[in-house]
Amino acid sequence: WIASQTHGYETVAFLSRDGYLPMKAYQIACRYCKELPQAEYLYSSRKALLPEMIVTENDLYDIPVEYHNHTPRTVLDLLSFCTKEYTDKQLKNDGFIGHKTFATRMEFNQFVRYVIEKLYDFESHKQSSDLVKRYYAEKISDKTIAFDMGYSGRIQAAISRAVGHGIDVLFVHGDSK
């Protein structure tokens, strides 16, 4: 299926982590069909692409996490690319317990508001975004098609934003979210 969809491309970028085994199978096929585009494994975790997933401060409310599995500390770890240094004492003084999981969406949203007002660092975010853009600009050209197992398409949208143009993607699974 992948081979039949890649005519005109030079590279198939298999997105980590789900793309690893399909890439290995594709590489076996490439041994027997030399005209297939080359395979490349492309690091593409949500955490690595967060600088491009978060375009405005309001996007912080929609970071790709299940809030009830996270604490202020774990959220700040994810957002370390765009937040100032903090201490547990500072969090506590401002009404948050660093290791306590969020019980409700409202509690999570209150913490995000706090991050925006007190800890968000635009300049750090810009530097991280520039780094992501440089990485993907070196890896993705208009002759590259990406392969991913699928789901929401947020990873591909972030990569497209990073490289400054839409990327073609082969999905195995789509999600309506």
Tell where the protein language model's regions lie, with residue ranges.
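Long, low-complexity, Lys/Arg-enriched
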Residues: 1-177
